[in-house]
Amino acid sequence: MSDSAYQNHLSILRKRFDQALLETDFDGVILASGRLTYYFGDDHSHPFHPYAMAQQWAPFDLMPDVFIHIQRGETPRLLWPAKQDFWHVVYPIPEGGWCDQWRVEPVSSLQEWLPQISGKTAWIGPEYNEAPGLNPNLSVNPEALLHRLNYQRAYKTEFEIDCLWRANQAGAAGHKAAQAAFLTGKSECDVYRDFLAASGQLSNQEPYPGIVALNENAAVLHYEKKNPLKPDAMRTLLIDAGAAYGGYASDITRTYTAGSGLFAELIERVNTLQLSIAAQAVHGKAFSELHQATLAGVANILHETRICSLSVEAQLDKRIPQVFFPHGLGHLLGLQVHDVGGHQQDKTGTLRKPDESAPFLRLTRTLEKDMVITIEPGLYFIPMLLDNMVKNIAGHGCDLDLIETLKPYGGIRIEDNVVVQEGRSRNLTREAFSALLA
């Protein structure tokens, strides 16, 4: 990645933060990466994930107890922990051209630098109980400033999009290995191990815990287990797993089947629908409209495969598609898998919640250039939702005998990471899979 892309990224961040500080009457802001936290009653720490707002400024993964101080109109400061420790790894300050744009200072404690900061200052990130007592001018996590910064996070810089592309490359490599493992009959646990190895990461480095679901388990949307035992039959693999690069996440889902027949046809139809919706994710399009188009697309699949005899319009009226596709179409993607600001309509924090027909939709904004989103339609055979349909929706028109034959397959989800552009979209995930074949 070029130094110029990072320098441009840093310049954009400085302008955004300077403007937000001016509008909220702050002189500066301190961003905290966070500190290690521990399991209750234990000296064993949780896996560390730096606070995203701090990570956004750095071209490398942040460690605990790193602070970034931005003073309006001045060169940003990176305060790096200078520890003497023979129990743990002591991380040196990373080298490179990035530091030409910074004041880099090794520090041993908050007491060493926090009392010297003057002016009205915001503290954003995990709270340090001792911090307010060291500087009376601190305001901890002020909402007005957070609203402005969270809203801007949706618009990705060239540097950020490149990080997301690299995360997709790693994730796609893992998915190809997972597919091969499934086709050779491996267990969920072994499929997961192959994914991690091919994507070049450990489980604690994943941007989110990977989902590896065989057969009926694919009907559990966030299936947490990874069974070490092989099932009697290998019908379906649904894998929802990503990778990270520079703190930026890929979020990729694929569904595979070992055979042919109706379920294989359903996978192809969902894939076609997914590509169509992803291509429509362009500047000026309301994301809620894309979700409604996806519901209509699911209804069409149900009708054409004779799973439901009702017309598309009748299905939508009775909310049949939501039985088979109960989650939202997608979300903002970036430093967090479910990136911030999805319901936020402006910089002051005005929210637009999803309507009752799509209660789980994580993104209600109109799409704009340089947003990065996921597009993830699904079609599942979830016993609880199907039972509710039979009990509560008269004249549902669904072929319950046919559905019984599909329940052992669990379900389908196909998910890509898409950059919104003017007049077209860029599908990072499809590009990454294509690059593996080049």
Curated annotation (Swiss-Prot):
Binds 2 manganese ions per subunit. It is an enzyme of class 3 (hydrolase). The keyword Hydrolase applies. It catalyses: Xaa-L-Pro dipeptide + H2O = an L-alpha-amino acid + L-proline. SUPFAM superfamilies: Creatinase/aminopeptidase. It comes from the Bacteria. Mn(2+) 1 binds at D251, H331, E376, E415. GO terms for biological process: proteolysis. Its EC number is 3.4.13.9. Its cofactor is Mn(2+). InterPro entries: Creatin/AminoP/Spt16_N (IPR029149), Creatinase/aminopeptidase-like (IPR036005), PepQ_N (IPR048819), Pept_M24 (IPR000994), Peptidase_M24B_aminopep-P_CS (IPR001131), X-Pro_dipept-like (IPR052433), X_Pro_dipept (IPR022846). One of its GO terms (molecular function) is metal ion binding. Keywords: Dipeptidase, Hydrolase, Manganese, Metal-binding, Metalloprotease, Protease. Mn(2+) 2 binds at D240, D251, E415. The keyword Transmembrane does not apply. GO terms for cellular component: cytosol. Splits dipeptides with a prolyl residue in the C-terminal position. Belongs to the peptidase M24B family. Bacterial-type prolidase subfamily. This is Xaa-Pro dipeptidase.
